[in-house]
Amino acid sequence: MKQSHIRNFAIIAHIDHGKSTLADQIMSLTQTVSAREQHAQLLDDMTVEQAHGVTVKARTVRNYYQADDGQEYEYNLIDTPGHVDFNYEVAKSLAATEGAILLVDATQGVQAQTIANYRIAKQRQLTLIPVLNKVDLPSADIDAALAQLNDLDSAFTPEQVLQISAKTGQGVPAVLEAIKQRLPAPQGDLHQPLKALVFDSLYDPYQGVIAYVRLIDGQLKSQQALCLMQGQQDFNGKAIGVFAPQMHPQESLSAGDVGYVVTGIKDPRKVRVGDTLTSVATPTQRPLAGYQPAKSMVFAGLYPKNNDYPALKEAVQKLNLNDPSFTYVEERSEALGVGFRCGFLGTFHLQIIRERLHDEYGVDVLTTAPNVTYHVTLTNGQQVIVNNPVQFPAFSLIKEVTEPFMKAEITMPADNLNAVLKLAEQHKGTLIDLANSGDLIVASLKIPLSEIAYHFFSELKSVSHGFASLSTAFMANEVSDLVKVEVDINYAPVDALTFIVHREDAPNMTQQLVANLKTTVPRQLYPTPVQARVEGKVIARVDVPPLRKNAAVNGEQHSTSKKAALLRRQSANKRRASKNTIKLPQSVFNAILSL
């Protein structure tokens, strides 16, 4: 295929605006998939994607389009996620393209991730095609959506915006033609040494690491001796090919193409996303810039339920290869044994990783409460970075603590402003700026990451009746008054339940926590005390009811000596029971998440 006939593009949009449905229509109209193979969200092949109805991993597929001028064009499409937790997936996918379709739901208008993805694309100087989806629905407000797009970018005039229904296929042929006319062809040089960007990867137990590559210069051939420049790893390409949407082997790939290389490398750590692939015989002199590594925002402990640590270790290594924004280091818990302290982009990302561990690797995990990174200055001037609440220093050693603050941009109708600002105030947010975008308002807030890592998104949807949308970006670390809450069950500290909270919130949160634990900690033969401590003082306590009655007050008439004997035996049994460790189910650790 001539390079002038190649188009590499992504579809970017807010969550649920119809990216995957449009991708399905493009594959159908270009006959990439047959009618028999066609089904909804064809590229969303993960179990978690089908369960949640969202795209988690970017997918690439090659299509061949017969244009109106009678010539055939190669369309390399990348379908990207829309959830705020997966911005990193969008950014690395856009690095492999020259343009993108900016998709907007006509019933929702421009939303937070529309704006965030638009900015990512503009930073990479990509050509954008604005497309309005779901115009066939009775609730579509086309004029308002067109006005919002024009406010976002003055180049998005009503004449430039394509109006479609991805579900019915209305207007999609015009999108295919616009891709050919408006998006630029790649500008690589076939005669230069091979230079290719590794923009994604997956692990196959038989073939090893399979790298997704975008060729910048040169040619790539099967069985060629290749080198990863940053990883300094040489290997022979076992096979190369393209996704259509399944893997289709090819004899060669040329500059501008998007495809895959079967590396045969069995160690997932040796192939990193963002690396430059080149030829051993004639290597390129300068590697590509690659990616800024994703910064983990939320941390949680993952421990194997059945003590199968080797299986968990192998699973997290392979997941890290496929999803570099997921990080891990080994840690040990007194209560749960050996596991990993893992970093995530958000709590939804954490949920997806848990489900992928179960679905793809058959590993069930216990998860501790998520937390953010704290920077602690000690009284001796030493700086300590804390990702695990257990490692939070004693209060007598601390001079000050800083935590990450985020810039949260909330896009909403004007009617929701008061309710949203009230919610932000409850979560220690302060208003920075208000701006208008058509008939929408964009509120910029400064808010602690720890306050939006849990239930803020769902509460925002609730108070705005589903109309508000959120995007976040890191601002700075600022000083906060924070304390460590430690939990004892049966007088034994449970380190996995330790968490860090603002001092003013500690009394209420600990009372709620011990009340939740009262119903989730397994009952024993004797009352089990559950208490929460802050700075060495118990500030909340409950007793988990026993399975049996108190022998001394069971309503029967006994002699004094008989009752004394019962009490002595019961007291001895209580002392023995206090030394027993209680096996804790996941519901105990979930008690923190519901605060």
Swiss-Prot record:
Originating species: Lactiplantibacillus plantarum (strain ATCC BAA-793 / NCIMB 8826 / WCFS1)
InterPro entries in the cross-refs: EF-4 (IPR006297), EFG_III/V (IPR035647), EFG_V-like (IPR000640), LepA_C_sf (IPR038363), LepA_CTD (IPR013842), LepA_IV (IPR035654), P-loop_NTPase (IPR027417), Small_GTP-bd (IPR005225)
EC number: 3.6.5.n1
Function: Required for accurate and efficient protein synthesis under certain stress conditions. May act as a fidelity factor of the translation reaction, by catalyzing a one-codon backward translocation of tRNAs on improperly translocated ribosomes. Back-translocation proceeds from a post-translocation (POST) complex to a pre-translocation (PRE) complex, thus giving elongation factor G a second chance to translocate the tRNAs correctly. Binds to ribosomes in a GTP-dependent manner.
Signal peptide: none
Compartment annotation: Cell membrane
Membrane topology classification: Peripheral membrane protein
A GO cellular component annotation in the UniProt record: plasma membrane
Name of the protein this chain belongs to: Elongation factor 4 2
Main enzyme class: hydrolase
Annotated family: Belongs to the TRAFAC class translation factor GTPase superfamily. Classic translation factor GTPase family. LepA subfamily.
